[in-house]
Regions:
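Hydrophobic/aromatic residues within transmembrane alpha-helices
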Residues: 18, 54, 66, 116-118
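Conserved phosphate-binding and hydrolysis motifs of nucleotide-dependent enzymes
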Residues: 27, 56-58, 64, 105-107, ...
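Glycine- (often His-adjacent) and acidic-residue-rich active-site loop
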Residues: 35, 56-93, 137-139
Length: 147
């Protein structure tokens, strides 16, 4: 089994559970997380997988892009492009795979986290869930397959 740094990937028979696991960063997406999500999506895109459940650890589903990692990247434009490319690959794979995708949204789903949350065939929102695009507040244009 592949070990991931920023997500938990658990398979039990035909069901896979993916947990975004950067609670100290509001499950914000950095280059490691988007690369791992793209790989996890590829692993789920099989006939053997019937259901994929995605959720977030801690108080947030996903706050979108990790703006701190964006700001500290040596080549900001190349870094953000890499994140967007991997995220789009993950979202595209999850959206077109035969397995049912359930997103279980706890807390905030913002920006790319919003786009990722609504990719689900079924979106389960806890009472704590809130959804916002939030791009203009960060001075960014929509990505994460939102446009």
């Amino acid at each position: 089994m592949t070990e991931y740094q920023t997500i938990k990937f658990e398979q039990a028979g035909a069901i896979t559970r993916i947990t975004l696991n950067r609670p100290d960063a509001a499950n914000g997406m950095d280059d490691t997380m988007t690369r791992e999500l793209a790989d996890a999506a590829r692993r789920c895109d099989t006939e053997a997988t019937k259901v994929v459940v995605i959720t977030g650890s801690g108080r947030f589903f996903c706050a979108g892009g990790d703006l701190k990692s964006f700001a500290s990247a040596p080549s900001r434009s190349r870094y953000i492009k890499g994140i967007a490319d991997d995220l789009h690959r993950a979202i595209s794979t999850f959206a077109r795979m035969d397995a049912v995708l359930i997103t279980s949204v706890n807390g905030v789903a913002a920006g790319a986290g919003f786009s990722f949350a609504v990719t689900g065939d079924l979106v389960l929102a806890a009472e704590s869930a809130s959804f916002t695009m939030a791009y203009t507040r960060a001075g960014l244009s929509p990505d994460g397959s939102a446009s």
